[in-house]
UniProtKB/Swiss-Prot annotation:
This is Large ribosomal subunit protein bL17. Part of the 50S ribosomal subunit. Contacts protein L32. Keywords: Ribonucleoprotein, Ribosomal protein. The lineage of its organism: Bacteria, Pseudomonadati, Pseudomonadota, Alphaproteobacteria, Rickettsiales. It comes from Wolbachia pipientis subsp. Culex pipiens (strain wPip). Transmembrane segments: none annotated. GO terms for biological process: translation.
Length: 142
C-alpha cells in the first residue's frame, strides 16, 4: 500500500525518474537556470535544495562523497556546490530556487517553467564552471 507517498511519478519508472532528476539537477547547478516542463520543475526543486543543504552543512570529505554518489560522480558540479553555492547561500535557511511559469510548449501545449537558483549572477549567463588542463578551476563561456 502506498499510504503517505506524495511524490510525482512523472509517468516514468523509478530508475528513469531518478536518472532524469539527477541529470536535471546537474544542469541546474551548472547553468543556474534551465527551462523545463512545470511538473518536472516542481519535482526537481526539493531534490536540488537538498543537495545545496548537504553542501552547506557538510564541507568535509563525507559531504563530498555523499554528493558524488548522488550526482553521477560529476566532480565539477560537486566542486561548484561546495565552493560557490555553499558560500552564496550560507546565510539563507532554505528556498534556494524559484519556479517561474513560462507559458506552454508549441508542439503539445505542455506547461513550461523556468527553474533558477535565487541570487544568481545574471551577468554570468552561459558561463560554465569547469577545469582547465592544469587542474585549476575556471569559468568558461559556452
Amino acid at each position: 500500500m502506498k499510504h503517505g507517498i506524495k511524490k510525482n511519478k512523472l509517468s516514468r519508472c523509478t530508475e528513469h525518474r531518478l536518472s532524469m532528476l539527477k541529470n536535471l539537477s546537474i544542469s541546474l547547478i551548472n547553468h543556474e537556470q534551465i527551462v523545463t516542463t512545470l511538473p518536472k520543475a516542481k519535482a526537481l526543486r526539493p531534490y536540488v535544495e537538498k543537495f545545496i543543504t548537504i553542501a552547506k552543512n557538510n564541507d568535509s570529505l563525507h559531504g563530498r562523497r555523499l554528493l558524488l554518489s548522488r550526482l553521477h560522480n560529476s566532480k565539477l558540479v560537486v566542486d561548484k556546490l561546495l565552493s560557490v553555492l555553499a558560500n552564496r547561500y550560507q546565510d539563507r535557511k532554505g528556498g534556494y530556487s524559484r519556479i517561474i511559469k513560462f507559458g506552454t510548449r508549441k508542439g503539445d501545449c505542455a506547461p513550461m517553467a523556468v527553474i533558477e537558483l535565487v541570487d544568481r549572477d545574471i551577468s554570468a549567463k552561459g558561463e560554465i564552471y569547469s577545469k582547465n588542463k592544469k587542474g585549476s578551476k575556471v569559468v568558461t563561456q559556452s
